[in-house]
């Protein structure tokens, strides 16, 4: 059995392996209760949402940033230049919220408006520049093992391959590539986007992912508070299963009660 440890990102330790987003909730009250139910420690915030004042200031004031670590994201950026500018704004927001040492950024560069698929070239370009500016970069990418390795090599602190398109709830569509990324990676692998139900979160963790990031599946559930708890349980169960080690698959049946040294009189 493997030994468990805390999730380590950029020199910080986190007990929870479930990261959560703050968008799409029906109210800030539902969001806050859902965040509490997930027991998450890392919360993503869309910097552009705050910049455009779409309830952004209210969001910053509502969340207790002594309890949660802010992960500013560059959602809405379509090229590397935009992403770099928004990342710098995000770092300032974290400082204004009391997290002076927070250099984290979830890097998203998405020019594709229909499927919201990330641009690998612009992501790699932005990541390299942000790392040189002392950011802890968590890049959102397609499930591309080669890109994931290149991002690791230039100094990214995690890679965040998508399970399926953002908000689609389609689950993990490319298990093979995700497994390769996990196998080859020396940094945490966080599955981001597409998870719809706790069993899919558990599946990601069973594969050996270091964590998952979930937003839509909780916020858009019929009962977000219950789904938040369920996702928490799913991530924990999947992690325990990974550490325990699954039974080997076999072509033939193997009786659980073998008839060995049993005498019948």
UniProtKB/Swiss-Prot annotation:
Q: Does the keyword Transferase apply?
A: yes
InterPro entries membership:
Aldolase_TIM (IPR013785), Thiazole_synthase_ThiG (IPR033983), ThiG (IPR008867)
Q: Which UniProt keywords apply?
A: Cytoplasm, Schiff base, Thiamine biosynthesis, Transferase
Q: What does it catalyze? A: [ThiS sulfur-carrier protein]-C-terminal-Gly-aminoethanethioate + 2-iminoacetate + 1-deoxy-D-xylulose 5-phosphate = [ThiS sulfur-carrier protein]-C-terminal Gly-Gly + 2-[(2R,5Z)-2-carboxy-4-methylthiazol-5(2H)-ylidene]ethyl phosphate + 2 H2O + H(+)
Pfam family name, one: ThiG
Listed GO MF terms:
thiazole synthase activity
Describe its function: Catalyzes the rearrangement of 1-deoxy-D-xylulose 5-phosphate (DXP) to produce the thiazole phosphate moiety of thiamine. Sulfur is provided by the thiocarboxylate moiety of the carrier protein ThiS. In vitro, sulfur can be provided by H(2)S.
Give the family this protein belongs to, as stated in its UniProt record: Belongs to the ThiG family.
User: Which HAMAP family does this entry report, sorted A to Z?
Assistant: ThiG
Query: What is the protein name stated in its UniProt record?
Result: Thiazole synthase
